[in-house]
Regions:
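Conserved, function-defining micro-sites of small-solute handling proteins
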Residues: 36
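Exported/periplasmic cell-wall-interacting domains
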Residues: 8, 28, 33, 42-48, ...
């Protein structure tokens, strides 16, 4: 447990991209803290959204702009250990952004994604079990 601003309600996810940390506020100015990978330069964002869907071992379909940048990527990948979304995914609003696991745990703490927030599979499984649909997510730069 770590201290956080008392301005956030219990159950809120606060993502600090500069710190490369995700906080799940538990109440009374306390939170669980997780390390994350964040968007690389040109792919960062800030704002408030909510968890709109949750998936275990999600399939992955790279967006068309990603396929243009990386034609070597598959057009679709079934969920599983090799899938870049990892063990769980929390979908953010109507965007293509997610909080998800990773098949590259060594990238946690780095700015490497296309705007999603990646966690170790162990951490995302824990977070997934703690948050319901509709959970408020605040992304700070």
């Amino acid at each position: 447990m770590v201290n956080v601003s008392a301005a956030y309600r219990s159950g809120t996810i606060v993502i600090n991209t500069n710190e490369r940390r995700l906080y799940l506020v538990t109440g009374s100015g306390q939170a669980l803290r997780y390390g994350i990978g964040v968007g690389r330069i040109g792919f960062t964002w800030a704002g408030t959204t909510a968890v709109s869907a949750k998936r275990e071992w999600p399939d992955w379909t790279p967006p068309s702009q990603m396929l243009r940048r990386r034609p070597d990527l598959p057009h679709h990948m079934a969920g599983g250990i090799e899938n870049p979304l990892g063990a769980r995914a929390l979908y953010l609003g109507r965007s293509m952004y997610r909080i998800h696991g990773s098949n590259e745990p060594e990238t946690i703490g780095q700015a490497v994604s296309s705007g999603c927030f990646r966690m170790t599979n162990e951490d995302v499984v824990d977070l997934y079990s703690r948050v319901p649909l509709g959970t408020r997510v605040v992304v700070l730069r």
